[in-house]
From Swiss-Prot:
Enzyme class: hydrolase
Biased composition (Polar residues): 61-70
Biological classification of the source: Eukaryota, Fungi, Dikarya, Ascomycota, Saccharomycotina
Organism: Saccharomyces cerevisiae (strain ATCC 204508 / S288c) (Baker's yeast)
PANTHER family: ATP-DEPENDENT RNA HELICASE (PTHR18934), PRE-MRNA-SPLICING FACTOR ATP-DEPENDENT RNA HELICASE DHX16 (PTHR18934:SF83)
Protein name (Swiss-Prot/TrEMBL): Pre-mRNA-splicing factor ATP-dependent RNA helicase-like protein PRP2
Function, as annotated: Involved in pre-mRNA splicing. Is required together with ATP and at least one other factor, for the first cleavage-ligation reaction. Functions as a molecular motor in the activation of the precatalytic spliceosome for the first transesterification reaction of pre-mRNA splicing by hydrolyzing ATP to cause the activation of the spliceosome without the occurrence of splicing. Capable of hydrolyzing nucleoside triphosphates in the presence of single-stranded RNAs such as poly(U).
A Gene Ontology biological process term: snoRNA splicing
Protein family (similarity comment): Belongs to the DEAD box helicase family. DEAH subfamily.
Region annotated Disordered, chain positions: 1-111
Motif window: DEAH box: 346-349
Gene assigned in the entry: PRP2
């Protein structure tokens, strides 16, 4: 059945037709009786229909009407089911009967019979009619679609493009309007009230978005840097290097790059502007904010690039936020950074290793690129040192928007600053009025998660006796969607507590903070050249850092800072400025990069602070052991290959050995997986590592083999989210692992390792024990300095200069579980990935070395003499 509805004035007239298929070439429309009034209308309509001969087929007849408006009404609805008469739109009277006619395509009949219209049945009748309308609507849509499909199939032929007509010369060829395809808008199926609701929701969404954009633009104008826009641009044009000093929240990071784009520094998209950040979280979050302000898609005009992740578009991105290490690596492919018109080194006061090396390299290329602009952004008072390094270049000061902050010290030192911080949180929460959020500085992910758990336990016990509290963590390995929660507005009658690392000192601006709790500690890497080991230490902050932390409380109004240390400690125990990373870290990766760029005299390379001679000497020694340098200190072919990988030289050596060494060939795929997993282990597990390990493998002897098995099982599940949930693994972390692995695989393919590995793999098969032995040998070749030996009192480090340091296996390691809880015999030799000092020296991510001769086979220049000497001493 098909119904056609037209309007005459305000009265709706329903016309219904029954379509009967006579043959493949003709369609006849006959009126269907729907009562006297409808039958009369249908007959009138049918009498107006005429048969029209098709120009394409003289035997084919189409139904047509000469009534203009009604012709269009007839098109798409002739094959539908019966529509309801307009009388059903009015109040239902007694003895009405609703019948759904059987359609052309043989669908089952949908009949609804109604009882007499006594007043007590009016509600029931109304409900049934409503259901019948819905059923009829579905039937009409289904019948129409099936009929269109049959029509299309009926017109098919073996050669649909070959049209042969008898007597074709007798016809004029024009586009026949009867052959047009009828379409319906998806909104046509909406009831009037539904359409009104849809349009209202759409209008509201558009209005909300317009208000949001206007709010963003208004907020931009309120930032302190906005009033200095013209003056700042003039100074940039006048000077090749400019130091910009401004407090966190002044807008220099987000607004200045936009000013440069608006002023034409990108030459209509031909050039880019690079803004470096010391941390991944800052690069990604700031890029997202700027893209939002510019009303563009993140990854197009505005993008970011961090290690193992590139969210930019070639020939499209003009603003690129990136970690300083990523810009440093671009020197390998473009030593003059020719695609950039301006480079902004943001948060330069943090003095990361990559930032210091970048500044030295940029100082060298500035004379070669006179049009390149260099902006050094700093939030502290050490801007003068940067100015002196660049021949006393000018300093532009952007005043911050800062309210007074009251500083509170403890009367005596606190033995447990975590416990003291939790106590202070509830002290503020229960005594201070709303609004006013709390920012707590902690040293790392473990402290943050432990504090978060404790706060949630206490809040659950307090229940409704205190105001609601929202706890939001922020640290580097937190998934990005969870990181963004710290920027969400705090609901009314609620307080937000942000648990953060030192990333919140300057890199991020969090609105709504009125209270800061500062234990005064930070976690730093400390490299000891004499032992050749890097330790992760928790150390006191500098005075500059704690002052920056206090300033976070004065962004939206007068605030308070609670320091969990005494004023005497602040004045006498804290260093004035933090130590530059270049003076306290392993420089092997940096030295290799500089040598690959052609820097031969490391002593004379321009640096703001010089590393110690022992540190440089130890780095050169490590590179020589890895085979990256020859005996003359010149970079080797292997060393140049290592530079192609976005990871430490030690990991690059592992991958190289896995594909080329005759005793290890064929395990590149496994080593790629393990290396990728080791980059993300801090955020890999939900809860305890041992629980996840037990669900993956019943028995495993090493952390490295556990990581390999986790990835393999996840891959076998087709990278399933549910598999991760079942095995207590972070799904987002595994996605990052997969991205890292893909990038490392592409690098391996580029330097020819994949082809060599495939050839060797065919010879060794897939025996697990054989594969694991080769994996262990590969890691020995890459980390010969990270091997400990079991002694009378436990494990001790090896090496002539670094031997004898007592270390313990960290409780999170599988080795600890095997030795302490399963009483398995400890292995004589163990390789570790990280040495950290907390209550004592711990080693993490451990790999068992079952055979002593593997050490001699893989690194004879170190272990042959060491093992022989110990053997001889034992015999004496």
């Amino acid at each position: 059945m098909s119904s056609i509805t037209s309007e005459t004035g305000k009265r709706r007239v329903k016309r219904t037709y029954e379509v009967t298929r006579q043959n493949d070439n003709a369609v006849r429309i006959e009126p269907s009786s729907l009562g006297e009034e409808e039958d009369k209308e249908a007959k009138d309509k049918n009498s107006a229909l005429q048969l029209k001969r098709s120009r394409y087929d003289p035997n084919k007849v189409f139904s047509n009407t000469n009534q203009g408006p009604e012709k269009n009404n007839l098109k798409g609805e002739q094959l539908g089911s019966q529509k309801k008469s307009s009388k059903y739109d009015e109040k239902i009277t007694s003895n009405n009967e609703l019948t759904t006619k059987k359609g052309l395509l043989g669908d089952s009949e949908n009949e609804t019979k109604y009882a007499s219209s006594n007043s007590k049945f009016n509600v029931e009748v109304t409900h049934k009619i409503k259901n019948a309308k819905e059923i009829d609507k579905i039937n009409r849509q289904r019948m129409w679609e099936e009929q269109q499909l049959r029509n299309a199939m009926a017109g098919q032929s073996d050669h649909p493009d070959d049209i042969t007509l008898e007597g074709s010369d007798k016809y004029d060829y024009v586009f026949d309007t009867d052959a047009m395809i009828d379409y319906t808008n998806e909104e046509d199926d909406l009831l009037p009230e539904e359409k009104l609701q849809y349009e209202a929701r759409l209008a509201q969404a558009l209005e909300t978005e317009e208000k949001r954009i206007l709010t963003i633009q208004e907020a931009r104008k309120l930032l302190p840097v906005h009033q200095y826009k013209d003056e700042l641009l003039q100074e940039i044009k006048k000077n090749q290097v400019l130091i910009i000093m401004g407090e966190t929240g002044s807008g220099k990071t987000t607004q200045l790059p936009q000013y440069l784009v608006e002023d034409g520094f990108t030459d209509q998209g031909k050039l880019q502007i690079a803004i470096t950040q010391p941390r991944r979280v800052a690069a990604t979050s700031v890029a997202a904010r700027v893209a939002d302000e510019m009303n563009v898609v993140l990854g197009k005009e505005v993008g970011y690039q961090i290690r193992f992740e590139d969210k930019t578009t070639p020939n499209k991105t003009v603003l690129k936020y990136m970690t300083d290490g990523m810009l440093l690596r671009e020197f390998l492919t473009d030593s003059k950074l020719s695609k950039y018109s301006c480079i902004m080194i943001d948060e330069a006061h943090e003095r990361t290793l990559a930032t210091d090396i970048l500044i030295g390299l940029l100082k060298d290329i500035l004379p070669q690129r006179p049009t390149l602009k260099l902006l050094i952004s700093s939030a502290t008072m050490n801007a003068k040192k940067f100015s002196e390094f660049f021949d006393n270049c000018p300093i532009f000061n952007v005043p911050g928007r800062r309210y007074p902050v009251d500083i509170h010290y403890t009367l005596q030192p606190e033995a447990n600053y975590i416990h003291a911080a939790i106590t202070t949180i509830f002290q503020i929460h229960t005594t201070q009025s709303l609004p006013g959020d709390i920012l707590v500085f902690l040293t790392g992910q473990e402290e943050i998660e432990r504090t978060k758990t404790k706060l949630e336990e206490i809040m659950s016990k307090l229940g409704s006796r205190t105001k609601q509290m929202i706890i939001t963590p922020i640290y580097a390995n937190l998934p990005q969607e969870q990181q963004l929660k710290i920027f969400q507005p705090t609901p009314e009658n609620c307080r937000k507590v942000v648990l953060a690392t030192n990333i919140a000192e300057t890199s991020l601006t969090i609105d709504g903070i009125r209270y800061v709790i500062d234990p005064g500690f930070v976690k730093e890497n400390s490299y000891v050249p004499s032992t050749g080991m890097t330790q992760l230490l928790t150390v006191p902050c500098s005075r500059a850092s704690v002052d920056q932390r206090a300033g976070r409380a004065g962004r939206v109004g007068p605030g308070k800072c609670f320091r969990i240390f005494t004023k005497w400690s602040y004045l006498h125990e804290l260093e004035l400025m933090p130590k530059p990373e270049i003076t306290r870290t392993n420089l092997s990766n940096t030295v290799l990069l500089l040598l690959s760029l052609g820097v031969t005299d490391l002593i004379k390379f321009p640096l703001m602070d010089k590393p110690s001679i022992p540190t440089l000497r130890k780095s050169l020694e490590n590179l020589y052991i890895l085979g990256a340098l020859n005996s003359k200190g010149t970079i080797t072919r292997l060393g140049k290959m290592m530079c192609e990988f976005p990871c430490e030289p030690e990991f690059a050596k592992v991958l190289y050995t896995a594909a080329t060494h005759e005793q290890c060939q064929g395990v590149l795929e496994e080593c790629l997986t393990i290396v990728s997993m080791l980059h993300e282990t801090p955020s890999l597990f939900i809860g305890q590592k041992r629980d996840a390990a037990a669900s993956v493998l019943s028995e495993v002897e090493s952390d490295h083999i556990l990581y390999l098995e986790i990835f393999n099982q996840w891959r076998n599940s087709k990278f399933s989210r549910s598999w991760c949930q079942d095995h207590k693994i972070q799904f987002k972390t595994m996605l990052r692992v997969r991205n890292i692995r893909n990038q490392l695989f592409r690098c391996s393919e580029k330097v020819g390792l994949v082809e060599k590995n495939d050839q060797a793999r065919m010879k060794i098969g897939n025996i697990a024990g054989y594969i694991n032995a080769r994996i262990t040998r590969c890691f020995i070749s890459g980390f010969p300095m990270n091997i400990v030996q079991l002694g009378p009192t436990g494990y001790q480090t090896m090496g002539r200069s670094s031997g004898g340091l007592n270390v313990s296996v960290h409780p999170t390691s599988i080795l600890f579980v095997n030795h302490k809880e399963k009483a398995q015999r400890p292995s004589k030799y163990v390789l570790y990935q990280q040495l950290m000092l907390t209550s004592k020296e711990f080693i993490r991510d451990c790999l068992v070395i079952p055979k002593e001769e593997w050490l001699i086979d893989m690194v004879p220049q170190i272990f042959k003499d060491l093992i022989d000497d110990k053997t001889n001493r034992g015999r004496r």
